[in-house]
Each structure stands twice: as structure tokens, then as C-alpha cells.
């Protein structure tokens, strides 16, 4: 993985993904030992789209590893306002840094960036396409909660059309197999066909599509809530009509298993009531911490800096 860009998780083997999760666990319990792993390294965060958590998570990850950070937040702060292409920006920035994290509203932008850059590029979200590091955070949370990322019934609820985190998670879980997906959404925000095709292509995975959360919540091991994203709508009336379709509160949680985990990529609007936050099944703030840890694992890996004392799960496979 040294020197490789991560645009989607498809470029990583399942063993490499598992090793990143294992590495994140190691980092969490060895904070002092790894604090100088990336001394002298510089990360560029090129965020053409607004973000708080993802950008701060990438930046904190490098800072906790001993490195430094440069970058911008918002297209209005970039040379794109002068007409500069993504490719030219990446060719320029590659001369300054060791690794780039890029977020862009257009699908495919991260791939364009990775082809232009001479340093590893990590996709921090490109349009409605993919968000690989959020998926790693999701997987790390499942691993922490259940000790596994297979043999689970996973409900995904809300905006399943534009939610890039949903698409990334489904496609990656299909690679590991043995997952039952319950896709909960209004007809206007159903899962795209290419994601359904991915589930159908995996013999050990299955899915059902439903509109009613309450009717299926008792069957779920995981409930992955999403917000209806206003920025993806051209018509505000459509957004307002769909915004409050699904709201998880303590009343609905009473129908769920005591062991169920509630995940959410954040930010939330009103789709999870605040009274759910204190429920032991609420795992979305754990995801935030896990997101930083997996980004620390990924950043140190792609620049080739080894964590002191860390033993890979399968050295030959992981180093490929």
C-alpha cells in the first residue's frame, strides 16, 4: 500500500482492509508510542466542498502522528475560482506534501486527482459516489461492537440515493459476505441499481427494500441512519417533503434488540432524536473517534511510515 492512492476500497484487498482496522485498534492503545511516526510529513487537505468532521479528522490524524497539515476548506478559497483544473492543482500541491486528502462535489474528482498527483491521494468523499475512509470508520465500529463485520443484519435508513457513505458501506460489506441488508427509504430515495446489482452478485448477501422502519427494526443488528441531504436537491419542496420521513427516537428503539448498534455518518439534522444519544446502542460518536483512528492508520501506511511495535496481521498480503 505504500505510495498508493485510495480512491475506493476496491483497490485494497480484504486482508489490507482488516489490517487497517487492526492497526487502528493498535493506535488507540499506543497513542504515546506512535506520536512521532510521521515526523516531517505534510498532509494537504483539499476540500472543495464544506466539511467539518472529515476535514478535522484527517488533519488531527496527521497531527497526532507527528506530521503537519496545509490546505483549504471551500472552493472559493482555491485557485479553481481562477479557472485552475483539479489536475493542475494536484500537480502543484504534490511538490509540497507527502499525501493529499481531497473532497469534491463531483463524482470521479478523486480519481482525476489521483492520476495527476505524484503522491498518494485519499478520497475524502466525491459527490454521491464513494467515501472510503467513512466506510473504514463504519467497519471499525462494527468490529468494536460485535467483534466481526460479517453475519449481521444491517438496516440502512433514509437517503439511500445520494448517500455516498451508504453505497461505500454496502459494496465493502459485500466483499466480506454473509450480510443481510434491509434498505429502508421512501421511493424517491431508493438505493441505486448499481448498488443493488452488487448485492445480487454476492451469493452470501441478500436484501429487502421497505418503507417502514418500525416494522423491521426488531430484526436488525445494525441501524445505519442517514440525513436527507438538502445540498443534493434542486427542488426545495422535494427536500422539505422528504426531510422528516424517518426519525429515530426512544419509542422506536424500544422495538429494537438490546444489542443493536445505531450508526450515523453525521452531521445529523433531526433524523435521530437527542434522547437517543444516551442509549447504549448509540454508536455514532464512537464512529467519530474510529474515523480519526483509521485515518491515522491509512495516512501512516500510504506514506510508508511504520508504527513502532506494530505487527501486521498478514505481512506478505498487507504489503502488496
Curated annotation (Swiss-Prot):
Catalytic reaction annotation: carbamoyl phosphate + L-aspartate = N-carbamoyl-L-aspartate + phosphate + H(+)
Pathway in which this enzyme or protein is active: Pyrimidine metabolism; UMP biosynthesis via de novo pathway; (S)-dihydroorotate from bicarbonate: step 2/3
Record-listed L-aspartate binding positions: 82, 164, 227
Xref: InterPro entries: Asp/Orn_carbamoyltranf_P-bd, Asp/Orn_carbamoylTrfase, Asp/Orn_carbamoylTrfase_sf, Asp_carbamoyltransf, Asp_carbamoyltransf_Asp/Orn-bd
UniProt keywords, alphabetically: Pyrimidine biosynthesis, Transferase
Gene Ontology molecular function terms on file: amino acid binding; aspartate carbamoyltransferase activity
EC nos: 2.1.3.2
BP GO annotations: 'de novo' pyrimidine nucleobase biosynthetic process; 'de novo' UMP biosynthetic process; amino acid metabolic process
Membrane spanning stretches: none
Keyword Transferase listed: yes
Binding site for carbamoyl phosphate: 53-54, 103, 131, 134, 266-267
Pfam families per record: OTCace, OTCace_N
Summary of subunit composition and partner proteins: Heterododecamer (2C3:3R2) of six catalytic PyrB chains organized as two trimers (C3), and six regulatory PyrI chains organized as three dimers (R2).
Reported function: Catalyzes the condensation of carbamoyl phosphate and aspartate to form carbamoyl aspartate and inorganic phosphate, the committed step in the de novo pyrimidine nucleotide biosynthesis pathway.
Protein family (similarity comment): Belongs to the aspartate/ornithine carbamoyltransferase superfamily. ATCase family.
UniProt-listed NCBIfam families: asp_carb_tr, PRK00856.1
Protein name, per record: Aspartate carbamoyltransferase catalytic subunit
Amino acid at each position: 500500500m505504500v505510495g498508493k492512492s485510495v480512491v475506493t476500497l476496491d483497490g485494497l484487498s480484504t486482508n489490507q482492509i482488516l489490517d487497517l482496522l487492526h492497526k487502528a485498534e493498535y493506535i488507540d492503545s499506543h497513542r504515546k508510542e506512535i506520536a512521532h511516526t510521521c515526523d516531517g510529513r505534510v498532509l494537504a487537505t483539499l476540500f472543495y466542498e464544506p466539511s467539518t468532521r472529515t476535514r478535522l479528522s484527517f488533519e488531527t490524524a496527521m497531527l497526532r502522528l507527528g506530521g503537519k497539515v496545509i490546505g483549504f476548506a471551500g472552493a472559493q478559497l482555491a485557485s479553481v475560482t481562477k479557472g485552475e483544473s483539479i489536475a493542475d492543482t494536484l500537480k502543484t500541491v504534490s511538490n509540497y506534501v507527502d499525501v493529499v486528502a481531497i473532497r469534491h462535489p463531483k463524482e470521479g474528482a478523486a480519481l482525476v486527482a489521483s492520476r495527476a498527483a505524484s503522491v498518494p491521494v485519499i478520497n475524502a468523499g466525491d459527490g454521491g459516489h464513494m467515501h472510503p475512509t467513512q466506510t473504514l470508520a463504519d467497519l471499525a465500529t462494527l468490529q468494536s461492537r460485535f467483534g466481526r463485520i460479517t453475519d449481521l443484519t444491517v438496516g440502512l435508513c433514509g437517503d439511500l440515493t445520494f448517500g455516498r457513505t451508504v453505497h461505500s458501506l454496502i459494496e465493502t460489506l459485500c466483499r466480506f459476505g454473509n450480510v443481510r441488508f434491509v434498505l429502508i427509504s421512501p421511493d424517491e430515495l431508493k438505493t441505486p441499481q448499481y448498488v443493488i446489482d452488487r448485492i445480487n452478485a454476492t451469493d452470501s448477501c441478500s436484501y429487502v427494500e421497505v418503507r417502514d422502519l418500525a416494522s423491521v427494526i426488531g430484526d436488525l443488528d445494525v441501524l445505519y441512519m442517514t440525513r436527507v441531504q438538502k445540498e443534493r436537491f434542486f427542488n426545495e419542496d422535494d427536500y422539505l417533503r422528504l426531510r422528516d420521513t424517518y426519525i429515530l427516537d426512544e419509542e422506536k428503539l424500544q422495538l429494537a434488540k438490546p444489542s443493536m448498534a445505531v450508526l450515523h455518518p453525521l452531521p445529523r439534522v433531526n433524523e435521530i432524536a437527542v434522547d437517543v444519544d444516551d442509549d447504549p446502542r448509540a454508536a455514532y460518536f464512537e464512529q467519530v473517534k474510529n474515523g480519526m483512528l483509521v485515518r491515522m492508520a491509512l495516512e501512516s501506511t500510504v506514506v510508508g511510515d511504520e508504527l513502532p511495535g506494530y505487527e501486521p496481521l498478514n505481512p506478505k498480503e498487507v504489503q502488496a
